[in-house]
Amino acid sequence: MDTKMEDVGKTPEPIRFQTTTEPASISTLDGWIENLMACKQLPEVDVLRLCEKAREVLHSESNVQPVKCPVTVCGDIHGQFHDLMELFRIGGPNPDTNYLFMGDYVDRGYYSVETVTLLVALKIRYPQRITILRGNHESRQITQVYGFYDECLRKYGNANVWKYFTNLFDFLPLTALIENQIFCLHGGLSPSIDTLDNIKSLDRIQEVPHEGPMCDLLWSDPDDRCGWGISPRGAGYTFGQDISEAFNHNNGLTLVARAHQLVMEGYNWSQDRNVVTIFSAPNYCYRCGNQAAIMEIDEHLKYTFLQFDPCPRAGEPMVTRRTPDYFL
C-alpha cells in the first residue's frame, strides 16, 4: 500500500530453514483452518510446518502464474482479519469460490499473523483454488517498520514466526495471468519490462530489491501523466495511459488489475479502462472510511465488482505504534 522505501533500513539477510518437521496431513490442515477462521493463532511449531509445506507449493509456481476462470480478484488486506471474513462471506468460502489475492496481507491491521497464516493454510489445502501474490509489504524491510514484526514479537515472544513468513514471502509469485487476458499484480508496470516473458525470466526468490523490474512490479502506480515518472514513494515508477495501452496491446491483454492504492469505493478504473485498482481493506487503518471491493470474473471473462463495508469492531487490542502512520 502507501509505503515509502526510504522508511526502511538495511536489508537483513534471508533466513533459510531446513525441513525438520513432519508434513501436515489434510486432517491436520483442516483443523488449523478451523482454528484460524476463528481468529486463533497457531503454535510456533505449526507455523514452521505450514511455511515449509507452503514453500514447496509456491516454488513450483511461475512468476506469471496462470489462473482459470471463474475467479474472484482481491486487493490489499493489511491484517484486517475480520474484514477478510466479511470478504469471504460476500464472495463465498474457499474452495467453493476461487480466489486471487494480489498481496499486502500484513502490516497496519491488528491481525496480520492470523490473516497471513489463514491465507497460507488455504493455499496449501486448496492449491488450485487460491492464488496468493507478493505485495510490497511481503518484505523483511517493510514489515520491520509497519507492524508485522512487532505483532509477531507480541504474540509469540520472539521473532521466529516473522522469520518463517518473511522467508516464505520470497517464494510468492509476482504476477498472475487470467485466461491469457487479464494481468494481475500488486503494484504496476516497469520500464524494464515489455513482455510477460521478461517477467518469467526474473529470479524472484529474494528480498524485494530497492530498484529494478521486480521492485517496480510491486511498487509502481498508474498516473494521469503520460510516460514514466518518478514515484513519490521512493521506489517504482508512475506510468501513464500510453504505457498501459502499449503493454496491453503488445501482450494481447484486455486489462491490468492491480492493488496497492487506497480507493474510496473499493475499485477504480483508470487510463481509459486499461487499468483497474482493487482495494479490499474497508475503513483502512480503522479510520479512512473507504469501502472495499472484490472483482468477480465469470467463465466468459465478464466481471462484476462487489463492494463491502467493514464488519463491526469489538475489543481491538491496545497496540502502541513505533512509527507514525502516513498517507500519500
UniProtKB/Swiss-Prot annotation:
Name the EC number(s).
3.1.3.16
Molecular functions (GO terms): metal ion binding; protein serine/threonine phosphatase activity
Q: Which UniProt keywords apply?
A: Hydrolase, Manganese, Metal-binding, Methylation, Protein phosphatase
Iron in keyword set: no
Per its UniProt record, what SUPFAM superfamilies does this chain match?
Metallo-dependent phosphatases
According to UniProt, the name of this protein is Serine/threonine-protein phosphatase PP2A-2 catalytic subunit
Which residues of the sequence carry a binding annotation for Mn(2+) 2? 104, 136, 186, 260
Does the record's keyword annotation contain NADP?
A: no
Give the residue spans that cross the bilayer.
none
PROSITE patterns under this entry? Answer: SER_THR_PHOSPHATASE
Top-level taxon of the source organism: Eukaryota
- Residues with PTM Leucine methyl ester: 328
SMART domains per UniProt: PP2Ac
A matching Pfam family: Metallophos
Q: Which PANTHER family match?
A: SERINE/THREONINE-PROTEIN PHOSPHATASE PP2A-RELATED
Record-listed Mn(2+) 1 binding positions: 76, 78, 104
Record field: catalytic activity: O-phospho-L-seryl-[protein] + H2O = L-seryl-[protein] + phosphate; O-phospho-L-threonyl-[protein] + H2O = L-threonyl-[protein] + phosphate
**CDD domains in UniProt:** MPP_PP2A_PP4_PP6
> Which cofactors is this protein said to need?
Mn(2+)
Residues at the active site: 137
Say which family it is in: Belongs to the PPP phosphatase family. PP-2A subfamily.
The record's comment on cofactor binding reads:
Binds 2 manganese ions per subunit.
Extract the InterPro entries matched here.
Calcineurin-like_PHP_ApaH, Metallo-depent_PP-like, PPA2-like, Ser/Thr-sp_prot-phosphatase
